[in-house]
Amino acid sequence: MVRKKNPPLRNVASEGEGQILEPIGTESKVSGKNKEFSADQMSENTDQSDAAELNHKEEHSLHVQDPSSSSKKDLKSAVLSEKAGFNYESPSKGGNFPSFPHDEVTDRNMLAFSSPAAGGVCEPLKSPQRAEADDPQDMACTPSGDSLETKEDQKMSPKATEETGQAQSGQANCQGLSPVSVASKNPQVPSDGGVRLNKSKTDLLVNDNPDPAPLSPELQDFKCNICGYGYYGNDPTDLIKHFRKYHLGLHNRTRQDAELDSKILALHNMVQFSHSKDFQKVNRSVFSGVLQDINSSRPVLLNGTYDVQVTSGGTFIGIGRKTPDCQGNTKYFRCKFCNFTYMGNSSTELEQHFLQTHPNKIKASLPSSEVAKPSEKNSNKSIPALQSSDSGDLGKWQDKITVKAGDDTPVGYSVPIKPLDSSRQNGTEATSYYWCKFCSFSCESSSSLKLLEHYGKQHGAVQSGGLNPELNDKLSRGSVINQNDLAKSSEGETMTKTDKSSSGAKKKDFSSKGAEDNMVTSYNCQFCDFRYSKSHGPDVIVVGPLLRHYQQLHNIHKCTIKHCPFCPRGLCSPEKHLGEITYPFACRKSNCSHCALLLLHLSPGAAGSSRVKHQCHQCSFTTPDVDVLLFHYESVHESQASDVKQEANHLQGSDGQQSVKESKEHSCTKCDFITQVEEEISRHYRRAHSCYKCRQCSFTAADTQSLLEHFNTVHCQEQDITTANGEEDGHAISTIKEEPKIDFRVYNLLTPDSKMGEPVSESVVKREKLEEKDGLKEKVWTESSSDDLRNVTWRGADILRGSPSYTQASLGLLTPVSGTQEQTKTLRDSPNVEAAHLARPIYGLAVETKGFLQGAPAGGEKSGALPQQYPASGENKSKDESQSLLRRRRGSGVFCANCLTTKTSLWRKNANGGYVCNACGLYQKLHSTPRPLNIIKQNNGEQIIRRRTRKRLNPEALQAEQLNKQQRGSNEEQVNGSPLERRSEDHLTESHQREIPLPSLSKYEAQGSLTKSHSAQQPVLVSQTLDIHKRMQPLHIQIKSPQESTGDPGNSSSVSEGKGSSERGSPIEKYMRPAKHPNYSPPGSPIEKYQYPLFGLPFVHNDFQSEADWLRFWSKYKLSVPGNPHYLSHVPGLPNPCQNYVPYPTFNLPPHFSAVGSDNDIPLDLAIKHSRPGPTANGASKEKTKAPPNVKNEGPLNVVKTEKVDRSTQDELSTKCVHCGIVFLDEVMYALHMSCHGDSGPFQCSICQHLCTDKYDFTTHIQRGLHRNNAQVEKNGKPKE
């Protein structure tokens, strides 16, 4: 019946919804179960497994020694059915609610204890510590010291009990397991919340079942103290995920870190209390009713959500959470006894579920003492919103009564204590548990005299914004009210937030309690991040500065300001939700042009101006008329009106924060990665740099622990400050604190300010540089003056563009760069160095926003001249890392080593580590051979993968194009296959090669030297750059006439001999280089055997780029060769570097031609067979490798094993293979095919000398590259494959 959930972190904090409060420590678990428990009276508890069991367990922990048959029953039932559905074991068993001996409780535990979530986490860890056999005194873990304190009746004096509670809470803090875990020295002390288990009762329960079955976890509210994110449930996992993802920037896939999660929950709790005014009393308050108040108030306060208790036949069966949002008033209902949850607006399904699944629970709550019930019901009616998730538990919100002083000032709250056993009530039925609203004072008494006496002594003149329930007045003004800001603080603040929440229902709920309280309200602009918090009385609001902000900065008249109670920022439209849009500041005067149309739509009382007074934030002037208020500002405070102080805190409510973040560009401080999606930058840091970046600032940490420590020490403190400010405002109404969020959005509504063009002070720039070098010091936040911040809105455009002109440090935009990076970036961006020192607008620059590097405010702006910037770091490792990452990004300077494309959906690596496009990579993976270039067609640099076509209408027309690709591809493949020659690709994209029209080689050299400053591989890049620009040219060469060449072949000596020989060549350079050994054929290319250059033709000149000329040259040469066989003879004076190749005639170009030398090879050699038998490399199917028919092959060549020319013995027009019977339509394909036939047989592979059985076997062998291993090939003197 009970489904056990075993989340990594258990929320033991509250076994029952009531226990939510209990974790607070105010009520012991027993108290949490009080209602049920009492209802479950020990005898009846058998069926009431949840509450009873929990109570028993609690009682167990409280009094292990006293067994009671009824408690035994309950325990049995719990054990048998685990009906409770709670996963927590009884405290005595070391269950989730451990009962620690007094000494076991530690402050650490207490901290963990502080919040239910934390408790949940710690609990599983520490629960084993609970000793069933703890002494009753030690065991008495009234979960909160409050219970101890609560019982004035107790033997201990209230003060003593309070002290005890404090001590326990301090100890319990460490436990964090559950408030219950705190042992109270006074075993008899009933759990707080007035759940007063009589000692005997508790003892009986405790002793009854040393091994009570684990109870199902009760539901509670989990809330992020940073942004207000919250939910209602029994598992803190989502809260931890949220915190990790949105506040630590950690990916949840790396969640397996129990220690970090525990710390997060502990932090969550500690922050909550640190925000509280009574932080100094945290230890006591953790277990005090105050905490109970805080936690229980959470459901009510959370973003306008509140809980609706669902009862069936008088039994509290679950909770409905009303969540006003843009989807309407949605509720989700959850069963109190199991995890059954559904979304909807009706509790009918929950009631049916309860009757079907938990029929045995029906009586459980009925037995609860009627005394408590009536009060419970009454209180529920009077304070519906305050009802805690566990209405069945007495001492919960539904029973809470506000205690007021003579002047109607709320001073505290009381909850009736429900005795466990009528026999043990001893006339204390009327006893209630009281706790102070302003501190952690609590007591048990039959009257409120003690509380009032305490209030008179301690807080006589103080009214702090504790519970700010009354928002009715502010409802009409809800548009400016943002409840999220204060969500993180202590109960008082929490309640304050509630006040802020604009939902009317919530306000109504609170109206019963304390409309008299001072409240802190956050006002925020709907269009930008202007925000401030004010403390004020219940009947006034301080909206003047906001209205003036709207009018002055956004040109929005107050009458047109919209407000929706369900959309905190007011940015909603009727179709998005069911809420009513109001115009809270509309004057509704018929002569007002702004209200003319509004009057048609506004409901009569929407403005509510008559009910609420507007107070000036600079003086005590109040008026119900907004117009009068604005006139007051203009007449009295005009000079000071703009003096709004911003709080330095940058961790504000989540509402505006996230939307603001989206508009900002995020740049990596370690490389040039830029994105507008914050999650991507966090992921980039994790994956690319193996570090974690703080979401709130530019701090990066090597591990999650240090990141959490940074967050705790820096940003949590900031939060505390903000909260404190919010509350202090109550006492200093004269100052408005604007709370800038982490990011600032800039709207076109902003008028440009002259300050935009002013240079930033040197101190600002220096400070930023210091911070960069120091590696993310947080001092920026304190150093940056409020004046700097005040200009944020004016300079927002610069900020968004990443301009260092603004003190980005103060905005959280500063992304520090390491010293070496900064230097190289400064070098690289020297043209724009001055931009770093000027706060000039960037509008005039025709460069993408991304061209500016946010992270390098001091000369770090990226130069827009170069399309891509390469990260240069002093360390080779980081350099290589960033380069490899850079290459992987689309269009960032890498091109395919096989087909030279720069555009692909995915970059892959070939066997040698070089980058290849997706198509080439997949082809090579599938066929074990590089992708033939004849199936690659490029259009504007983009590959068009087409089918091979054997029939071409105009073969001549395609020769040039194919020739280029054939040469590029064959050379590329040669290098791909050669591990010796594989090097990292050059970083220049084709845009450098083709778009930079440098007319002479000297300019290429200059370009190379320029590149030198961009990359750490300076010598390599220089040679690569030169080689690319010099050797790319053979692809577009123009030769007037081959016969004209009469110059000295010596011209072919390579200009870039030294550089070109660099093994770290570019993808193109490798095509131009001869193989290391004439016979060496790197593996992988189907046409590698033809790739060996014969000699360096002086074919490089920028002017020869015409495809037509290139084609004309080859056509002329093709025609000349058959009729001029002497051209194929060795030219005596030719410096032929590859003696084993048939020499081509040397063509002398005009003297101004720059010779590239022997590094160039051209497609001419494709038609010539190596003189040695089969030096050709592994041959992929020659049919596939269609090369342009540049030269007519002279039939099957007779191979002579000397350095002589291969002569043709067949008619040159014969293109049919005599062995395979294949007829080729062009001579080159025929030559390629014939070169695969060895000399020892018709079907011998010339590459590996393998003898195939027939032509099919031979064709398969060649196409698939099934050559024998390298060792055997080498042994036979054949080239390695």
UniProtKB/Swiss-Prot annotation:
Consequence when changing residue 952 to H: In TRPS1; prevents the transport into the nucleus and thus reduces the nuclear TRPS1 concentration consistent with haploinsufficiency
Entry keywords, A to Z: Disease variant, DNA-binding, Isopeptide bond, Metal-binding, Nucleus, Phosphoprotein, Repeat, Repressor, Transcription, Transcription regulation, Ubl conjugation, Zinc, Zinc-finger
Glycyl lysine isopeptide (Lys-Gly) (interchain with G-Cter in SUMO1) cross-link, renumbered residues: 766, 1201
Composition skew (Basic and acidic residues), residue ranges: 53-63, 148-162, 488-512, 980-995, 1060-1072
Residues covered by region (Mediates interaction with GLI3): 635-819
Keyword match Zinc-finger: yes
Gene Ontology MF annotations: DNA-binding transcription factor activity; DNA-binding transcription repressor activity, RNA polymerase II-specific; protein domain specific binding; RNA polymerase II transcription regulatory region sequence-specific DNA binding; zinc ion binding
Sites of Phosphoserine modification: 90, 127, 178, 216, 978, 1041, 1066, 1085
Result when mutating residue 952 to C: In TRPS1; prevents the transport into the nucleus and thus reduces the nuclear TRPS1 concentration consistent with haploinsufficiency
Subcellular location: Nucleus
UniProt cross-references to Pfam families, sorted A to Z: GATA
GO cellular component annotations of the record: chromatin; nucleoplasm; nucleus; protein-containing complex
Crosslink site: Glycyl lysine isopeptide (Lys-Gly) (interchain with G-Cter in SUMO2): 29, 76, 263, 418, 457, 474, 488, 645, 737, 755, 766, 825, 850, 877, 879, 925, 937, 965, 1003, 1012, 1030, 1040, 1070, 1192, 1201
Biased segments, Polar residues type: 40-49, 163-189, 380-391, 961-977, 1040-1049
Bias kind Low complexity: ranges: 1050-1059
Region of interest (Disordered), residue spans: 1-198, 365-394, 483-512, 856-887, 961-1000, 1039-1080, 1168-1196
BP-aspect Gene Ontology terms: negative regulation of transcription by RNA polymerase II; regulation of chondrocyte differentiation; regulation of transcription by RNA polymerase II; skeletal system development
Zn finger residue spans: GATA-type: 896-920
Principal place of residence: nucleus
Zinc finger (C2H2-type): 222-247, 333-358, 614-637, 666-689, 692-715, 1215-1237, 1243-1267
Position of the Glycyl lysine isopeptide (Lys-Gly) (interchain with G-Cter in SUMO) cross-link: 1192, 1201
SMART domains in the record: ZnF_C2H2 (SM00355), ZnF_GATA (SM00401)
Region Mediates interaction with RNF4: start-end pairs: 985-1184
Pathology noted in the entry: Tricho-rhino-phalangeal syndrome 1: Autosomal dominant disorder characterized by craniofacial and skeletal abnormalities. It is allelic with tricho-rhino-phalangeal type 3. Typical features include sparse scalp hair, a bulbous tip of the nose, protruding ears, a long flat philtrum and a thin upper vermilion border. Skeletal defects include cone-shaped epiphyses at the phalanges, hip malformations and short stature.
Protein name per the record: Zinc finger transcription factor Trps1
Gene name per UniProt: TRPS1
